[in-house]
Amino acid sequence: MKLLRMIFLVLIVSACSSPKADSPATAKQEFAQFTKMAETLDNEFMDESRNFLTENGHLTGDKAQKSALKWLKEIDSKQIQKMNSLQIKDPQVNRLRTLFIQNRLDTEKAVENDGYAKKPSAKAMEINQKIERNKTEYRQLFDTLKKKYPL
């Protein structure tokens, strides 16, 4: 598990240090690719979550949490691989991808630490705050790029 997270961290760091895009046209194409991929992955996630709830809605307590966490890790792993398959050179678009991936990993941590419980632990609250900061940065950067490169 720790090895997998370290691999993801290395991928994220290497993605963050990639060179600048060749031209604004390339950055616009990369932003369009990212947007399409993010939308596709979000739609897949929603479909898969409906299927998961249909199949596992009867579970409760620890069994439900363990099952949900296992499912979440599987789908996140697939989605992170797909997102990392994009060839992105533009640093701003790359930052969006990094935030997208980080949100997936932090959500897993929040689920592991009962972050979505009625009374989350201090660690879970810290993770939730990080998720909110990243979401805010993601939305702001996405809006900036959307104005810069209209779709």
Language-model segments: which ranges?
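N-terminal hydrophobic targeting signals that begin at the initiator methionine
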Residues: M1-K2, S17
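Sec-dependent signal peptide recognition
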Residues: K2-L9
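C-terminal motif of bacterial Sec signal peptides marking the signal peptidase cleavage site
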Residues: I12-A15
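Immediate post-signal-peptide N-terminus of mature secreted/exported proteins
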Residues: S17-K70, K147-L151
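Hydrophobic alpha-helical core bundles mediating ligand binding, dimerization, or RNAP-core interactions
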Residues: F31, T35-S49, D76-Q79, F100, ...
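Soluble, cytosolic/nucleoplasmic coiled-coil alpha-helices used as oligomeric scaffolds and tethers
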Residues: N51, H58, K89-Q92, L96, ...
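Long, amphipathic, charge-rich alpha-helical segments that form helical bundles/coiled-coils
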Residues: A68-I131
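Short, low-complexity, Pro/Ser/Thr/Gly-rich segments in the mature regions of secreted, periplasmic
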Residues: N134-L151
